[in-house]
């Protein structure tokens, strides 16, 4: 399944004509690409989207900067650099880490 690079791409490709709908569609595609499981811990409970580089630190709404994330990991990670936070977690998985890095590199 192909996830476009940003919500705006859904507008440009005429998949929708509403910017709100474009963002909803983009977020849904992100979740689908991760099989509705948290990229960090693998949970499928209360799934949301996490900016790998937080928006407060310059991160943007680009597919390479977001992952599917459970609300627990999202709150716990907060504004901490993701690798620093992830390496310190008991549930750290080299397989999930590699998938996140691969997604970042595109």
What spans do the regions from the language model cover?
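Intrinsically disordered, low-complexity regions enriched in Ser/Pro/Gly/Gln/His and often acidic
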Residues: 18-19, 27, 75-78
């Amino acid at each position: 399944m192909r996830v476009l690079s940003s919500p705006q791409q859904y507008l440009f490709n005429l998949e929708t004509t509403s910017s709100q709908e474009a963002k909803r569609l983009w977020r849904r595609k992100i979740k689908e690409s991760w099989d509705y499981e948290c990229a960090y811990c693998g949970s499928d409970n209360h799934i949301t989207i996490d900016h790998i580089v937080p928006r407060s630190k310059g991160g943007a709404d680009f597919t390479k900067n977001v992952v599917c994330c459970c609300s627990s990991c999202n709150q716990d990670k907060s504004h901490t650099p993701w690798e620093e936070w992830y390496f310190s977690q008991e549930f750290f998985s080299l397989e999930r880490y590699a998938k996140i890095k691969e997604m970042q590199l595109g």
